[in-house]
């Protein structure tokens, strides 16, 4: 870290679903700004790789394995183990873990798929916030950044289920901002548009027709989306609560 990378010095952060892709970028960016980050996800090897990446920047972090599809007990375990790993408190919570869903007609989606998608994308962050936010409120400060999506902001045929889960996250942000804001806890959403990660880099050419519809004519970078998360987590955004910050190249504006 450079001497100027201290916006989050002395803070602790938990980033769910941070063993790869956007989540790993969020964890790394928060650590680079001085936060002690708890990385979390299902894959131990990938989690340790993210720790190595963070360590290479001169920052420190810990890893807590968690599979948020396993229900309330797993969410509670993550909250307690992450709090312990972070030295007794979590100052920043990034609700990033999500089940990505392939486009499909609504009529082809099975009931179990609906249950599974909402379990990870909605129920898990709902329960985790219900544990972490009151503790933040008791201390009088904290920042929660929910990761939404362009899918939760606009209509997108073939993506009804995923869009519904993300629209729910956007709604929860507003409710939680009102619930916890008076006690010093800010809750905001970052809503990414198309972004290239190691998981979808192989379909970059297939995204070309989609990107042609976006004012910026390109996908967002991981760094750009992570910068939005860092901003909302930091005191630079102290006056922002209940907002959705879109990082989509202007797609949601048209």
Which residues are covered by each model-predicted region?
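Active-site helix of classical SDR
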Residues: 129, 165, 173
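C-terminal substrate-recognition "lid" of short-chain dehydrogenase/reductases
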Residues: 126, 218-253
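Residue(s) in the substrate-gating loop at a strand-loop-helix junction
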Residues: 149
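A glycine/serine/threonine-rich, flexible loop-to-helix segment
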Residues: 107, 182, 189-214, 224, ...
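Alpha-helical segment proximal to the catalytic Tyr-Lys
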Residues: 134, 178-182, 238
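Substrate-binding pocket helix/loop in short-chain dehydrogenase/reductase
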Residues: 104-106, 110-118, 144, 200, ...
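Conserved glycine-rich cofactor-binding loop
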Residues: 12, 19-20, 43
